[in-house]
Curated annotation (Swiss-Prot):
It is a single-pass membrane protein. Residues 67-83 are lumenal. Residues 1-20, 130-170 are annotated as: Disordered. Residues 105-170 are stromal. Part of the twin-arginine translocation (Tat) system that transports large folded proteins containing a characteristic twin-arginine motif in their signal peptide across the thylakoid membrane. Involved in delta pH-dependent protein transport required for chloroplast development, especially thylakoid membrane formation. TATC and TATB mediate precursor recognition, whereas TATA facilitates translocation. It is found in: Plastid, Chloroplast thylakoid membrane. This is Sec-independent protein translocase protein TATA, chloroplastic. The chain crosses the membrane at residues 84-104. The gene is TATA. The keyword Transit peptide applies. InterPro entries: TatA/B/E, TatA/E.
């Protein structure tokens, strides 16, 4: 997997470190080259470094979203897999190598087991939480609200009120 060379063009402005292409066709060709670099699975950081600016980053991100929006395309390629927290295969290999150097080969299996147990407990807690939410939504959604007590008067209260008022007036 090789990288495409970045061409520079002579420029009259000295304020910019990047030179502008002499015509619009060359600009479209450069944008297509950046899109190929992004579609090849390079990270956006690397493609913005190759193109030399934030404008290239926007083009690379747009090209990546267009390339990944197809029905069967899943960002393939050996270097294109962003597996965990945006880390690719090379980053994970470096992290594993540093961990092997720091902890040593005897402690690595123990550390791996403890990390696995922690991840398993988090997954179990998430499943329990999800089942509780489903259970609550199933219980509360189908039943009508409980009936409220309504005061039904049979006329007995009115007779008592009349009797008490007549006693007071006497």
């Amino acid at each position: 997997m090789g990288m495409a060379p970045v061409a520079t063009y002579p420029s009259s402005s000295s304020s910019s470190t990047l030179a502008r292409p002499p015509c619009a066709a060359a600009g479209r060709a450069a944008a297509a080259g950046r899109a190929r670099v992004a579609a090849a699975g390079m990270s956006s950081r690397a493609s913005s470094f190759v193109t030399g600016g934030a404008g290239g980053l926007a083009v690379a991100v747009a090209a990546r979203t267009r390339a990944g929006s197809g029905a069967g395309s899943r960002g393939g390629g050996a270097m294109g897999c962003k597996c965990l927290f945006g880390l690719g295969v090379p980053e994970l290999v470096v992290i594993a190598g540093v961990a092997a150097l720091v902890f040593g080969p005897k402690q690595l299996p123990e550390i791996g087991r403890s990390i696995g147990k922690t991840v398993k407990s988090f997954q179990q807690a998430a499943k329990e939480f999800e089942t509780e939410l489903k259970k609550e939504s199933d219980d509360g959604g189908d039943q009508p609200p409980p009936p409220t007590e309504t005061a039904v008067s049979d006329g007995g209260e009115e007779k008592e009120l009349e009797a008490s008022s007549s006693k007071e007036s006497t």
